[in-house]
């Protein structure tokens, strides 16, 4: 059986979709799985034991430069392969067009009422019907379940997929060694994920500082690194992950450096971030891909939501918690209610995990 997965972007969506694909090797041991992805996000799927062939496309780059001929040539080279199933897990017109160009026995995706872009739904031979507003976990599981000859009921498949999700994400020993050199000896590492695609999805520097103080038991700041008067832990170290907002990272570092071990991480590619996440005892951040990666790699996490609805985006796991600052979130880019989540509430959850 030859299966092609089309999920081109974005990072968080790829991570969640990939988590549900991991179980397919268990269900279909002889299956070959190819994955079509934009080059910007290919690193998150590299070194996977589940993916047989990673088909990397310069989609964004070619579209930005209007190099449509180059893009078509790039896609057509994959037509030498014939797949049993091509599954578009994205539901956009661009992903549906790509899937349509591939040779397959069955081309599957979301129907026109369920796809993010309804026109995409008309291109599939089989379309899964599930409300776009439904849980992203259920949507990803359902489109795979409906497309493939799975010999078990949906609930069993769903939980099989959730249990197997960590098998998808791999990295090299070189990546692991690079990460190990950044860690503190004898500490439990808490990763603060400082950025997201939108400012409204990021927890503020002020709140991260208060959270660090709460974890150290130094809510008022007068107890120093050894303070434990408010339930702090001396075995905790904080790592700060940022990509562009170095000023935010430096502000948090300066406020926490006298209270507990803290370090600003160097810029990392996606392979290094996978190796980093594998060593984290807890990851805390907004509704963004790296926070989702903690769930996907079965690492403890606390995901913070504000302008996106918790019921739709929450990723559930044994040690994966979610908190929301707005029970009526409606995707408003000016909604910064993520910062209504009290740092002490997050710290309380963190203590339960650690």
Task: Say what each PLM segment does.
Residues 1-354:
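Catalytic machinery of carbohydrate-active enzymes
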């Amino acid at each position: 059986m030859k299966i092609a997965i089309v999920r081109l972007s974005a990072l968080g969506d790829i991570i969640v979709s990939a988590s549900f694909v991991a179980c397919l090797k268990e269900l279909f041991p002889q299956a070959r799985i190819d994955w079509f992805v934009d080059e910007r996000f290919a690193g998150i799927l590299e070194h996977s034991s589940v993916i047989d062939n990673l088909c990397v496309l310069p989609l964004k780059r070619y579209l930005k430069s209007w190099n449509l001929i180059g893009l078509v040539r790039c896609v057509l080279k994959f037509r030498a392969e014939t797949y049993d199933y091509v599954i578009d897990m994205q539901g956009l017109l661009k992903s549906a067009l790509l899937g349509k160009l591939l040779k397959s026995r069955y081309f599957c995706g979301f129907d026109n009422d369920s796809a993010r872009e309804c026109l995409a739904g008309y291109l599939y031979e089989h379309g899964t019907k599930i409300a776009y507003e439904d849980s992203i976990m259920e949507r990803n599981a359902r489109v795979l379940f409906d497309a493939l000859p799975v010999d078990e009921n949906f609930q069993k498949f769903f939980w099989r997929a959730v249990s197997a999700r960590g098998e998808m994400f791999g990295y090299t020993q070189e990546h692991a060694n690079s990460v190990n050199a950044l860690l503190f000896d004898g500490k439990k590492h808490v990763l603060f994920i400082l950025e997201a695609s939108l400012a409204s999805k990021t927890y503020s520097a002020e709140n991260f500082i208060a959270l660090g103080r709460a974890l150290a038991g130094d809510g008022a700041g007068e107890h120093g690194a050894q303070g434990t008067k408010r339930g702090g832990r001396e075995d905790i170290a904080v790592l700060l992950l940022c990509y562009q907002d170095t000023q935010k990272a430096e502000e948090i570092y300066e406020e926490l450096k006298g209270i507990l071990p803290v370090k600003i991480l160097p810029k990392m590619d996606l392979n290094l971030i996978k190796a980093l996440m594998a060593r984290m005892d807890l990851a805390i951040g907004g509704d963004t891909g790296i926070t989702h990666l903690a769930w996907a790699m079965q690492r403890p996490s606390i995901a913070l939501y504000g302008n996106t609805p918790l019921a739709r985006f929450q990723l559930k796991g044994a040690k994966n918690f979610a908190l929301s600052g707005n029970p009526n979130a409606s995707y408003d880019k000016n909604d910064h209610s993520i910062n209504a989540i009290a740092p002490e509430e997050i710290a309380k959850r963190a203590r339960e995990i650690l």
